[in-house]
Amino acid sequence: YEIHERLVGSEMCIRDRYEGLHVVVLSNQGNYISILIKSILTSMLVGAALAIVVLAIFLKDVKPTLVVGVSIPLSVLFAVVLMYFTGLDLNVMTLAGLSLGIGMLVDNSVVVIENIYRLRGRGVPAARAAVQGARQVGMSVVASTLTSVCVFLPAVFSASLIRNLMGPMSLCIGYCLMASLIVALTVVPAASATVLKNAQPKKLAWFDKIQDAYGRSLEKALKNRFVPLAAAVLLLVFCCWRVVSMGIVLLPTSTSNEAMITLSTTDTLSKEESYDVAGKVVQAVMAVDGVEEVGITPDNTVAGMDVSNLGLPSTITDLLNAANGYGKYKINVKLNEELSSSKIDAACKAMEDAVAGVADCTATVQQYGMTDDLTSQLSTGLTIKIYGTDAETLTALSEKVVDIVNNTEGFQNATNGLGAGDSTIILQVDRDKVRANGLTVAQVYQQIAAKLTTTTTAQTPVTVDGTTMDVQISNNLDPLTKENMMDMTFETTVMSADGTTATGTCKLSDIASWTTGTAPDSITSENRNQFVTVTAETAPGYNTTVQARAVKKALDAFALTDEMPEGCSFSMGGESDSVNYMTDEMIQWMALALPFVYLVMVAQFQSLLSPFIVLFTVPLAFTGGLLGLLLTGQQLTMISMMGFIVLMGTVVNNGIVFVDYANQLRMGGMERRAALVATGKTRMRPILMTTLTTVLAMLQMVFSNDMASQLMSGMAIVIICGLSYATLMTLYIVPILYDILFKKPPLNVDIGSDKDLDDIPDDAAEFIAAQSSAAQPQ
């Protein structure tokens, strides 16, 4: 992005320096970053504003709303300071982390301020309500924050691509959470003690009715506890089956206002005719509605070498260009930036139709996207490697594999990458005749190469109108062509039997013959085995991993037939390979995070069983995210899988607060089910408030139609639907699991004090007593 800004300034300087120069930028990846940053910043501001609106609705009071509103910029500022001292830049991933953190960082402040506000409503003085309210939920808030931080911890210490993608974002989310914890336990109580002195908590009649209805429904659920539990498990199994059957894609599809057309003209055309066809294609593309700029460059290469600047004679250059299928072009197209995604797709389809109307050429239209840089590091589409030892056999086999892929539904533009091959002149030198003329084969080839190379390496300074330029001199006199090549003469030296030498000349036709042939444009090998790579694009509306299964089945069947040459084998890769790799990484991430989350909850609950109540809601809460993908028609991608990671760190928060508060009531002597109903009704408001603040912060990413939302919408849908479903899990499934697993009330362990040493082992008691007596003044 910074380079893009500098280049814009340089471009203006160049225009001022050279009058009449016209510069058109056809491709600019800095625009993607700019769009992403603007979209994420908008989401941050909208999310913060909506969070304040939610607080105002539920609390119906400006003062506590302002307290939480002040905590948002304080927490963000604290997180940005931590980012600065740890060397994190403000980029797309870190800003995405801050955007997610906006919705999560108010959770702690909401829980604390709601509890303080509730105590004020019961008549507790402001100062005492601030201290007591923060103390009641303090440990559960600390535990819920630490569990969320632990979920993102594996990404920081990972050594794979996951760290590069999620490491900065995970650190930003962790910084936001830790900042929100500090602010919630310090700034919020301190501000509440002052701001809420004269506050008069208002009754919410509509919410009281909702609480009463929830209490009655929870009592019925506890009486028939296995019915909702079984329904939740069955729904989870169904969603997992449906999503897996749909397949997983690497990255979501994204559109941009840039496209590239790969154009090939018919080989029989001359250079001028090829240029004429290319001009017609450009005119046809320019006529498409929405196209602003078009740039075209020739792709005249031979076996990967540019031959346009080697200084070869024109006849040889023409021969090489024709041999390589001269007439290959790259056309860059820039569309109107105001076009929506659907109109950009329509414009690309219109360009395909327009190019199809031009004779003597074939072309493919490909959109650029924000994910192109990432997909360049990972394989996309379908890739099949065919191994063997003979180039001709591999070429023939690859053509059959191309036919198999093209006949498989869901793939298009399958190719073996070999093309038609390059036309070559094969010179066959007769070694006996060469030796008879006193020459060597190496001398023959060296003289032919010297004749072909007509450009001197030395540069001659030439001054034109006061401007000095270095030029290379090219000798185009007597050019070597296919017709006169065999007339090339060589000086010979022949020694007779009596020891005398005789000099003379011979023509190339006297010692060699030539034929024409076709050579492959590339030869690749791996572990000393040659291979050909067949690639194909996934057609719109199809899933690569699902369709690749059909291709593999067809290849396995082909391998059992007599058409499969001996010594050849297939190896499938591409996007399915990358998907499997990323899925394994994500599963390992979750597997590493769960033990950390469990240990934090063990320390909080002082129980090995209580954490399982909360952990059991994690896979059930995934049901919400999967349902969201199914209902919106989204595919499971690597980005949406990150949403499940975020979900795993957030769904446990409300469960921790619920179980902790229920334990406090039961230790106070309340009956089990009565304590669960009372806990549900008491914690219902902060649970709904924290859920809504996070959900509303994500809505901007879902309903916006910009390019950034196309990339992040899958993750936002998973978080929104997952948290919404997790709210039901917390309000119903957590009480049901608690009722099943905890028949006895939790023990209230009295750890005593320093003055009471009766329960302390003798050695420790003597040590403490000795330290106390030594500290007393004599």
PLM feature spans:
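Helix-loop junctions and hydrophobic alpha-helical segments within the transmembrane domains
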Residues: 26, 33, 37, 113, ...
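Extracytoplasmic/periplasmic
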Residues: 249-332, 391-424, 767-772
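Hydrophobic transmembrane alpha-helices and their membrane-interface caps
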Residues: 45, 49-118, 596-683, 688-704, ...
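Extracytoplasmic/periplasmic membrane-proximal domains and adjacent transmembrane bundles
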Residues: 6, 10-11, 15-49, 56, ...
